[in-house]
């Protein structure tokens, strides 16, 4: 039978695409994880709706990418910065899973990049780079036959402006915000108009309407406005479509709302609060939808590669000979019906960390991550000693390190090291990256500590929960999706570290008490966590529906335009008189169609 499925082509633009093992990708954080997994999940979800979805992921070509593995296209795209025009080279590669990635390369812009450094630290350098790559991507997109553009974060947020209004009238553009803390805020040089003109945009036309943010450029603000104006959808990575919970709800909170909430928590005015939207009140005014990211089923304990002996044999792994032997001797995958294997993993983890067989029933409390401000893992050091006193069977296993140049993170790293030296049989600290060990810690641990300052998506809570490692953390952003099977504390005053540590420790005590005195309840909680549906099916379906919605919005915009033109034509000789009296109401009393009508009348010089 002939294929009657509808075809749809999507260009998905992002600065990180994952696929680091291929040497042709980039992953600094969760963005790379999501962009790697999302395309194939979208294709599957679209097929269920009888849509043949073709996705091309657009990525910068970083200097460490092996261009010999890429296919160079017979296409050069001109880019202009500060009046100087040069050309980007374009490459493509089809990965074994069938997914196509298009790469954009210019030596002058990208020669400095490394696997751990793909974002410029200087805002002005970043502005030029993001502008250049966005111009190149827009030039490529306009030469294709894409029906939808899906942007990920502000780094590619200039693309709609380089596509131009004529293109945007026909093709919907959507924006997914993975982290609103970083908005592309850049100081002006020579004023707003000149700052935009240097990146090949008409400053007088665009600056005040889209980019102006307290006398800075704000790339995220500009992209949000343009996407909304042209009928696209703005989404973020946790919450529901109505934005009633998760990161979508947090971004809508005003400073006054956050301050009031913080005051209620501590019974006194806070010293300082962290604002998820960074005072960009556009988040409070535009509809922000949440589409909660999923995870590949490979992260479930029954599938996790790092619990398979054959996989571990190819990796640098464990220090303890018993742990090494046992992990290589057989697979240790498990599920909710095979929890004795998790108990064995707990034993092997204890051997690896402390070199001895566990006595009685220790509680293994784990933390895996980066010692950076966002993750707030330094707070764990504040509660270790009081936890050791509270329950003599508690032990901590910390796998975390600070980036070079992060003074606060390095101080936390040193503090953890001192605690490990003071309590060698109760505190284990490792500051080197070890993937198999990180998975063993997750799989063998009882509790996972996640006191994040903010967590837009929160994949780490899924990762821990699926392995029966119950989360103890802060109720923020995407972490709230596991609230039904976790111990979450609420705290917003980031200046009151003692108060936050007390709130954190209160949840720690509750978790320990449940483990010790209510084992049935703990087992129920663990089984609930392991049964979480963390897959991509629901999320991918919502993204596909968003693409369909965008096409329908274009249809509505076209019909609305036709309606206005028809009405103006019907006015005949009364056009001038009507225009003199016509003035749409503002704010909540205004009608969007009225404003569109006024805009058209102005274009005809009737107002």
Regions found by a protein language model. Give the residues of each.
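Catalytic cores of nucleotide-sugar-dependent glycosyltransferases that transfer UDP/GDP/TDP-activated
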Residues: 2-579, 583, 587-595, 605
């Amino acid at each position: 039978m002939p294929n009657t499925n509808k075809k749809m082509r999507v260009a998905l633009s992002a600065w990180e695409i994952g696929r680091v093992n291929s040497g042709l990708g980039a992953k600094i954080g969760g963005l790379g994880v999501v962009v790697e997994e999302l395309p194939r999940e979208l294709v599957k979800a679209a097929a269920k709706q009888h849509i043949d979805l073709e996705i091309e992921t657009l990525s910068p070509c970083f200097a460490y990418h092996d261009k010999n593995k890429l296919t160079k296209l017979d296409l050069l795209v001109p880019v202009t910065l500060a009046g100087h025009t040069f050309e980007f080279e374009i490459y493509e590669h089809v990965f074994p899973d069938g997914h196509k990635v298009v790469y954009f390369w210019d030596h002058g812009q990208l020669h400095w990049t490394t696997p751990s450094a793909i974002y410029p630290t200087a805002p002005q350098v970043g502005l030029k780079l993001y502008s250049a790559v966005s111009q190149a991507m827009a030039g490529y997109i306009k030469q294709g036959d894409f029906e939808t553009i899906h942007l990920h974060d502000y780094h590619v947020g200039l693309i709609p402006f380089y596509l131009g209004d004529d293109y945007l009238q026909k093709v919907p553009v959507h924006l997914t915000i993975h982290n609103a803390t970083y908005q592309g805020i850049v100081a002006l040089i020579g004023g707003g108009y000149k700052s935009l003109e240097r990146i090949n945009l008409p400053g007088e036309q665009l600056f005040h309407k889209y980019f102006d943010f307290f006398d800075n450029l704000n790339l995220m603000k500009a992209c949000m406005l343009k996407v909304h104006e042209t009928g696209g959808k703005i989404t973020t990575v946790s919450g529901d479509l109505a934005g009633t919970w998760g990161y979508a709800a947090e971004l809508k909170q005003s400073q006054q709302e956050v301050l009031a909430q913080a005051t209620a928590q501590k019974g006194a005015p806070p010293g300082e609060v962290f604002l998820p939207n960074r005072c960009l009140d556009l988040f409070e005014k535009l509809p922000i939808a949440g589409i909660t990211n999923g995870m590949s089923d490979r992260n479930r304990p029954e599938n996790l590669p790092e619990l398979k002996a054959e996989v571990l044999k190819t990796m640098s792994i464990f220090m303890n000979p018993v742990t090494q032997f046992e992990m290589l001797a057989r697979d240790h995958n498990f599920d909710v019906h095979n929890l004795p294997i998790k108990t064995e993993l707990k034993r092997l983890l204890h051997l690896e960390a402390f070199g001895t067989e566990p006595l009685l029933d220790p509680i293994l409390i784990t933390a895996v991550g980066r010692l950076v401000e966002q993750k707030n893992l330094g707070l764990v050091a504040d509660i270790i000693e009081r936890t050791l006193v509270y329950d003599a069977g508690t032990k901590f296993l910390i796998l975390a390190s600070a980036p070079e140049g992060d003074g606060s993170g390095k101080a936390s790293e040193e503090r953890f090291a001192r605690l490990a030296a003071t309590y060698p049989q109760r505190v284990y600290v490792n500051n080197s990256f070890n993937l198999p060990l990180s998975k063993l810690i997750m799989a063998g641990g009882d509790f996972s500590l996640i006191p994040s300052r903010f967590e837009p998506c929160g994949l780490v809570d899924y990762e821990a929960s699926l392995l029966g490692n119950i989360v103890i953390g802060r109720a923020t952003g995407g972490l709230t999706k596991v609230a039904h099977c976790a111990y979450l504390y609420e705290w917003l005053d980031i200046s009151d570290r003692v108060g936050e540590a007390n709130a954190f420790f209160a949840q720690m005590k509750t978790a320990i008490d449940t483990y010790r005195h209510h084992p049935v309840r703990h087992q129920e909680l663990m089984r609930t966590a392991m049964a979480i549906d963390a897959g991509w099916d629901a999320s991918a379906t919502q993204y596909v529906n968003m693409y369909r919605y965008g096409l329908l919005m274009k249809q509505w915009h076209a019909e609305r335009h036709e309606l206005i033109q028809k009405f103006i034509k019907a006015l005949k000789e009364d056009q001038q008189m009507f225009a003199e009296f016509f003035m749409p109401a503002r704010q909540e009393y205004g009608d969007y169609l009225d404003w569109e009508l006024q805009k058209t009348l102005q274009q005809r010089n009737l107002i």
